[in-house]
Amino acid sequence: MKIDLVKAAEKDAELIHRMQVESFREIYLKYKDDETNPINESVEKIVQKLKRSDSHFYLIKFENDFVGGVRIVVKNDHKRISPLFVLPRYRNKGIAQAAISKLEEIFGAENWELETISAEKINRHLYEKMGYRLDGKATIINDKLTLVFYRK
């Protein structure tokens, strides 16, 4: 799978916002999560994240189109993926897996963490296939949604 990660800038905040809304809409409707779902992030909040010195936001490019995004927060030698998203029409093509592999080439393959929805088996399978393991922590967001935490 050939993808490129293009470093996002402040000018990309509206594009990121539109892609997040489209990418997370189905999850939002399913779990009614007003607290943590990126669909609720404003463009201004995305700009703030883009400006942070510990934050690296990338647009995922596939066949000349931006098809998603991923943000990495680096603290010391620990890296956290939050969020990773691919537009619905580009899913199940290996794009997220290719993006994670590229990130590990850029930032190193160790000391990663992320969270995902416990009930989303496709996401969990992806992360486990990439070598991530549950760390035993979980956070209940509401009666429909529990987040589980992974490390690598």
Regions found by a protein language model. Name each.
Residues 81-82, 92-103:
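Glycine-rich acyl-CoA binding loop
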Residues 59, 65-73, 80-85:
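Conserved beta-strand in the GNAT
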Residues 105-118:
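Conserved GNAT acetyl-CoA-binding A-motif
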Residues 3-18:
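A short beta-loop-alpha structural element at the N-terminal edge
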Residues 45-59:
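A short helix-loop-beta-strand connector motif used in the catalytic cores of GNAT acetyltransferases and
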Residues 97-98, 102, 119-136, 142:
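Conserved active-site alpha-helix within GNAT-family acetyltransferase domains
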Residues 21-47:
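Conserved GNAT-fold acetyl-CoA-binding loop/helix
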Residues 84-91, 116-118:
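A short, internal acetyl-CoA/4′-phosphopantetheine-binding micro-motif in the GNAT/acyltransferase core
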